[in-house]
């Protein structure tokens, strides 16, 4: 529950990916002319023009599914984090026993003890499997499900705590679909050859996990078949990923009696009592899915349900157990699904888990090392210029009524901005890291950390929301907009070259992180964010005629992206990616306007490397999204990720943006040219 699944759907983010390879410190931000491919005209393919040189000389590391600017910066940040974490571990004077930084260092150190993990074998997970074996009848399933939530597990559905969508000042309980092993509903339901193959591979994967847990081959194969069939039944009642983008559909408050009518097997009052969750109402994101859980429990035998629950435990545990489990998890989830040939080295895997569970303890050290105060001050100035530019845009819109403009400007005026790191650091005082030879294991500490975060969230139920909290750690190379807080958050981790350098040319900064800032701001006004008001509540503030015009513009933009074909027969899903695509176009637009405001304040700079400020702006925009992907990673992204492939995140918005046409003299006949009537202009 460090970042709830349903909340992740609602929050707009810039990009999700992992990193690898030996880090090189990012160069001082600017336009690297060696990355340009002069054989490509910018008017035809700006992505290849700006990045062609880089694409030609870059090989995706064997332990990565894709590689780009985000990965390169993550590599650099990984090295910084590892360095400061090791220093903390060695300095018992500054970080004595009981301090959060000592806990982070100990968590990492125990995770790195591969001999300890190998010697433990299956022992760390046996108590969880024993709990499943002890379920005597179906009336006891709810008890296991509740206890499983308390250790961060998921089966049948997810229980989460975050602000009430319609009363964002109060924390609420949510139940959403979950507890299946494939990434998304369509993996279970599509009937094309690749989807069928994936399900077969998944069945083999589950069988292998059962064999590693000690089952005979025949029993393991039979169990895997049962698991796939049961999960498929659950998937049939899930909302599509496009439907999940509608927060109105996800908001279905139910009192206990209503919940018992939907899914009686849970025994909701007792379930909440075990969780010590003081709630008499739960917001159900997918009532039909919850009904499907009830039907599955009735239709399947207790033994089959136990088999499903065991598979969920083994899937979750595998990355933290002995090598054979880790390898099996990698072979299916990363190698097969994403096409990555090589596993990340252990230190990177353990560091990522340490960051997930003790991220702010590490973040405090990272900020001291890598984020000076001046960097925060200049970033805040940039945010203000871009916000003002957006306000100007709203005032001049010819398709929006004055009443809706008034509400939009009111929402923008209440935007909260978090830059760099939290004002108040999270305390991990209640987290126990086992270090004694009798108790210590990597998996045990993962469970302890997960349990700490779950209980930390549950105890907030019914209480006022603490808006000072962050949903990303300071070292994260990403950013987000949270509609429930009406805030944008930019961690120190992404406020680094090549995205941002407080010492560098502002045209490049505005084209880089500035476009990202604009992207996140405008998430508050995309197909999801536009349904929340300035207080963060799910509330329509649009005139109906304006909403119809907005949707029509969005439909036209979605249709453009649906025509892109990254792989043969595999098209971008324009409706699914619409929010992020609007964010890219709008972010580009208001960042460009924000740069013009900066020039009025500070003067217009000269050419650099014979490039005008506008050319540098656009080239920086093209640079930050440079990415090479393996086909399987790209396929997985298209199926599960609301972000479009990198080439379209560049060429798509630019082909609709008039200043790009003016700067690079794009005319009819050029590949990026669109007739004026076809260009989408939303903000």
Label each residue range with its predicted role.
Residues 15-17:
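C-terminal motif of bacterial Sec signal peptides marking the signal peptidase cleavage site
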Residues 25, 38-44, 49-116:
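Active-site-surrounding "flap" and adjacent substrate/cofactor-binding loops of secreted or lumenal enzymes
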Residues 10, 63-85, 219-237, 509-515, ...:
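Short secondary-structure subsegments characteristic of cysteine-rich extracellular domains
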Residues 88-385:
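Noncatalytic, helix-rich "gating/capping" subdomain that lines the substrate-entry/channel surface
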Residues 19-28:
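Bacterial Sec signal peptide processing site at the extreme N-terminus
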Residues 5, 227, 262-265, 283, ...:
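Intrinsically disordered, low-complexity linker/terminal regions across diverse proteins
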Residues 5-13:
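Sec-dependent N-terminal signal peptides
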Residues 35-56, 192-211, 578, 585-590:
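Hydrophobic/aromatic-rich, well-ordered segments within soluble, folded domains that form packed cores
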């Amino acid at each position: 529950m460090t970042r709830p699944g349903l909340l992740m759907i609602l929050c707009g983010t810039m990009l999700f990916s992992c990193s690898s390879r030996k880090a090189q410190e990012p160069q001082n931000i600017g336009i690297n002319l060696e990355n340009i491919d002069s054989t490509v005209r910018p008017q035809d393919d700006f992505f290849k023009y700006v990045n062609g040189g880089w694409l030609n000389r870059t090989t995706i590391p064997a332990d990565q599914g894709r590689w780009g600017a985000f990965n390169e910066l993550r590599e650099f940040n990984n090295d910084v984090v590892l360095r400061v974490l090791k220093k903390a571990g060695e300095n018992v004077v500054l970080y004595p026993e009981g301090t959060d930084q000592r806990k982070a260092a100990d968590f990492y150190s125990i995770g790195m003890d591969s001999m300890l993990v190998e010697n433990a074998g299956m022992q760390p997970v046996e108590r969880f499997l024993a709990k499943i074996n002890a379920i005597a009848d179906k009336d006891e399933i709810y008890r296991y499900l509740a206890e499983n939530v308390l250790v961060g597990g998921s089966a049948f559905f997810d229980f989460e705590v975050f602000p009430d969508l319609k009363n964002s000042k109060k924390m609420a309980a949510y139940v959403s679909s979950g507890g299946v092993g494939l990434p998304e509903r369509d993996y279970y339901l599509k009937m094309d050859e690749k989807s069928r193959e994936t399900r077969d591979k998944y069945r083999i994967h589950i069988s292998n996990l059962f064999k590693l847990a000690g089952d005979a081959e025949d029993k393991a194969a039979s169990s895997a078949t049962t698991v796939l069939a049961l999960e498929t039944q659950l998937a049939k009642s899930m909302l599509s990923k496009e439907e999940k983008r509608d927060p109105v559909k996800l908001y279905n408050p139910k009192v206990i009696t209503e919940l018992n009518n939907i899914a009686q097997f849970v025994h909701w009052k007792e379930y909440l009592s075990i969780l010590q969750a003081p709630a008499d109402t739960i917001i159900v994101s997918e009532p039909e899915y919850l009904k499907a859980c009830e039907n599955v429990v009735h239709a399947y035998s207790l033994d089959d349900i136990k088999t499903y629950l065991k598979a969920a435990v083994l899937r979750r545990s595998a990355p933290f157990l002995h090598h054979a489990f880790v390898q099996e998890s990698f072979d299916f989830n990363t190698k097969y699904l994403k096409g990555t040939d090589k596993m990340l080295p252990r230190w990177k895997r353990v560091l990522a888990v340490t960051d997930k569970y003790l991220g702010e303890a590490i973040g405090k050290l990272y900020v001291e090392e890598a984020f000076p105060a001046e960097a925060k001050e200049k970033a805040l100035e940039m945010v203000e210029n871009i916000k003002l530019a957006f306000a100007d845009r709203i005032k001049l819109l010819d398709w929006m009524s004055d009443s809706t403009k008034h509400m939009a400007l009111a929402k923008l005026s209440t935007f909260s901005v978090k830059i760099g790191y939290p004002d108040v650091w999270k305390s991990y005082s209640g987290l126990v890291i086992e270090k004694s030879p009798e108790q210590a294991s990597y998996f045990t500490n993962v469970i302890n950390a997960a349990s700490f975060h779950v209980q930390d969230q549950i105890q907030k139920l019914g209480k006022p929301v603490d808006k000072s909290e962050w949903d990303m750690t300071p070292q994260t190379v990403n950013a987000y907009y949270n509609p429930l807080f009406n805030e944008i958050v930019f961690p120190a981790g992404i406020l680094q070259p090549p995205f941002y350098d407080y010492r560098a040319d502002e045209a490049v900064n505005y084209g880089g992180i500035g476009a990202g800032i604009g992207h996140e701001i405008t998430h508050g006004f995309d197909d999801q964010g536009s349904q929340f008001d300035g207080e963060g509540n799910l509330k329509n503030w649009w005139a109906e005629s304006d909403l119809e015009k907005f949707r029509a513009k969005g439909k036209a933009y979605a249709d453009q992206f649906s025509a892109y074909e990254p792989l043969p027969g595999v098209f971008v899903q324009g409706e699914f990616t619409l929010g992020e695509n609007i964010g890219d176009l709008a972010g580009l637009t208001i960042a460009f306007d924000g740069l013009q405001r900066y020039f009025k304040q500070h003067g217009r700079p000269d050419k650099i490397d014979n490039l005008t400020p506008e050319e540098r702006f656009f080239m920086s925009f093209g640079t930050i999204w440079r990415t090479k992907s393996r086909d399987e990673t790209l396929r997985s992204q298209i199926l599960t990720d609301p972000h479009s492939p990198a080439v379209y995140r560049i060429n798509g918005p630019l082909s609709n943006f008039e200043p790009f046409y003016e700067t690079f003299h794009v005319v009819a006949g050029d590949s990026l040219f669109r007739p004026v009537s076809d260009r989408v202009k939303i903000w």
